[in-house]
From Swiss-Prot:
Keyword Transmembrane helix included in the entry's annotation: no
Any GO CC annotation of this UniProt entry: preribosome, large subunit precursor
PTM sites of type Phosphoserine: S377
Name listed for the protein in its UniProt record: Brix domain-containing protein C1B9.03c
Skewed-composition ranges (Basic and acidic residues): 323-350
Region (Disordered): 323-389
GO molecular function, one term: rRNA binding
Segments forming domain Brix: 28-309
GO BP annotation list: cytosolic large ribosomal subunit assembly; maturation of LSU-rRNA from tricistronic rRNA transcript (SSU-rRNA, 5.8S rRNA, LSU-rRNA)
Superkingdom field: Eukaryota
């Protein structure tokens, strides 16, 4: 007989994610240096950047004023975090630092201009509110970025690789095109500034009349069902579009904005409205990008070797001679050697203290054992004396 009152454990039927693949996915944290001291505007930008980095980011992270960047780097390893995006503010500028956790390098940017999500929506005539677009990572599009470094620009490859490694790679052969819902555009201008734009992808079927498109849209959402109370017959609506009012006319779609995808399993409405030839041929979709923010204009200031400072690999405003670079290398070599020496001394001190603690513990144990033996021998002598009496 089964256990009465035993709680039933539901077994999930969907496939579990591969832990190896989960570990390979880049994860990020967007934090404010100094917490609320950066101001309200930069705090809102932090929130918008967290939405942009979804779903593999800490969306509800709460910073404290006492938290330091070193604390986040310490926790990055156990949590699997690969990148830290640190926003800070000085008296004159707002700054963004991208740190490759846990040991660097670090890319330091100056934020010249930025616009929040709410400001971008305010500029649009028909703003679109995202729904399920943040369940999948965005598609990264980079323009005017170099894969190979040169003597004049040794930092180009590192800059490009850093941005690419912040998001999971997309395979053209295996990625489902319907899972790509957002686009993150990074455009490198001639003056070296980087424009960041964030879009959601809106698709619309091509080759289908507007009345049929309205009916297909109404099948998914009741509020989109067209009003047919003025139409005598459904054919008047399908053939002539009677009953459609207040909608803007469709603009002509460019060929570059039209793609063909494999048609999924048709719905009942599609089977009734579309012909057999239309159901068999690939489905054409018109793609439109709708900006949702945030916007940023970044300038790369410098690149450092470590997560917390270290050797300066590149600086946009400071140019050193070969002799100065050699002196800098010698200084960092001495600092690294001194750091390793101190670490060895600390490890040796910890080992010695543990050995001393263990030795004292063993001596204490031996002392208790010897005292117990003496007590036992004394008890035996007293018992023998009592027997002779």
């Amino acid at each position: 007989m089964g256990g009465i009152g035993k709680k039933r454990v539901k077994k999930r039927t969907h496939l579990k994610a591969d832990p190896i693949q989960e570990a390979a996915i880049p994860k990020s944290m967007v934090i404010r240096s100094g917490a609320s001291e950066v101001g309200r505007s930069l705090s809102l930008l932090t929130r918008d950047l967290r939405h942009m980095m979804e779903p593999h980011t800490a969306i509800r992270l709460k910073e404290r004023k006492a938290n330091k960047i070193k604390d986040y780097l310490t926790m990055a390893g156990p949590l699997g975090v690969t990148h830290l995006l640190v926003l800070s503010r000085t008296d004159n500028n707002a700054n963004l630092r991208i740190i490759r956790a846990p040991r660097g390098p670090s890319l330091h940017f100056r934020i010249h201009e930025y616009m929040l999500n709410k400001d971008v929506r305010r500029l649009q005539k028909n703003p679109k509110s995202p729904t399920t677009e943040f369940l999948t990572p965005p598609l990264l599009v980079m323009n005017h970025f170099n894969q190979n470094s040169s003597k004049d620009s040794p930092h180009e490859a590192l800059l490009t690789t850093t941005f690419q490694n912040m998001f999971p790679p997309i395979s053209v052969q295996h990625t489902n095109i319907n899972s790509v819902k957002r686009v993150l555009l990074l455009n490198r201008r001639d003056d070296g500034y980087i424009d960041l734009r964030h879009f959601i992808i809106s698709t619309k079927p091509v080759g289908i009349s507007r009345p049929i498109r309205h009916l297909l849209k109404g099948e998914k959402k009741d509020s989109d069902i067209p009003d047919l109370h003025n139409v005598r017959d459904i054919s008047d609506y399908v053939l002539h579009g009677d009953g459609i009012s207040g909608a803007a006319s469709d603009s002509e779609i460019e060929e570059d904005a039209t793609v063909e995808i494999d048609r999924p399993v048709p719905t009942k409405t599609e089977e009734n409205l579309l012909s057999a030839s239309q159901l068999l041929k690939p489905k054409q979709q018109a793609i439109k990008l709708i900006e949702i923010g945030p916007r940023m204009t970044l300038e790369l200031i410098k690149i450092t070797e470590d997560a917390m400072g270290g050797k300066v690999l590149y600086h946009s405003h400071v140019h050193k001679s070969k002799e100065e670079i050699k002196q800098q290398d010698n200084f960092h070599e001495q600092s690294r050697a001194l750091k390793e020496k101190r670490k060895k001394e600390q490890d040796e001190n910890v080992r010695r203290k543990r050995e001393n603690k263990k030795r004292r513990k063993d001596q204490k144990k031996e002392g208790i054992t010897s005292s117990n033996k003496n007590d036992d021998s004394g008890n035996e002598g007293s018992s023998a004396y009592s027997d002779t009496e």
